[in-house]
């Protein structure tokens, strides 16, 4: 008789719970940031007049303009390659206070100095940003040779594991 009760309890437990499910944290993001040039290398290319390639290492901070917790008050780093205003691309790294990181790659689509416009795409992350995807646009304005502000607008999705939930049936 006791075996029957144990079997019934196990069967009930198995039908009222599920394995971890995948949920998703998603939203719209409006980030405002400031960057300073930490390191810059300029390389002259002699194939045409005034052709230079710049490699920039920038460091700064970004906050969520809507006050939401996503990438709010985070460190903001950029590694960029700019080819005489013809092309520009690189990588953005956002680091939250808890150490979680979100990574993005970007491409400049319009260059009218001191303003650069382009697109970015989240490529992954660590900690709470593991598996992040999404994309958006940016508008960067150089205030001097060492300082810029950047406005980013886009959407993101972050998969999150949800512990076994009770079956409501």
Model-found features: residue ranges?
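Positively charged n-region of N-terminal signal peptides that target proteins for export
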Residues: 1-5
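Bacterial N-terminal signal peptides
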Residues: 7-18
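Beta-strand-enriched cores of mature, soluble protein domains
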Residues: 22-169
């Amino acid at each position: 008789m006791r075996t029957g009760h144990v079997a019934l309890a196990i069967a009930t437990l198995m039908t009222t719970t599920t394995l971890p499910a995948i949920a998703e944290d998603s939203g719209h993001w409006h980030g405002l940031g400031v960057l300073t040039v930490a390191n810059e290398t300029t390389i002259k290319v002699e194939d045409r007049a005034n052709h230079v390639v710049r490699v920039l290492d920038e460091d700064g901070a970004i906050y969520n303009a809507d006050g939401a917790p996503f990438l709010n008050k985070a460190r903001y780093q950029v590694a960029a390659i700019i080819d005489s205003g013809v092309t520009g691309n690189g990588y953005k790294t956002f680091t939250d206070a808890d150490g979680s990181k979100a990574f993005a790659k970007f491409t400049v689509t319009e260059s009218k100095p001191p303003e650069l416009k382009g697109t970015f795409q989240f490529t992954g992350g660590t900690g709470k940003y593991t598996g992040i995807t999404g994309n958006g646009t940016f508008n960067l304005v150089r205030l001097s040779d060492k300082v810029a502000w950047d406005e980013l607008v886009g959407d993101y999705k972050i998969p999150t594991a949800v512990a076994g939930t009770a079956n409501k049936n």
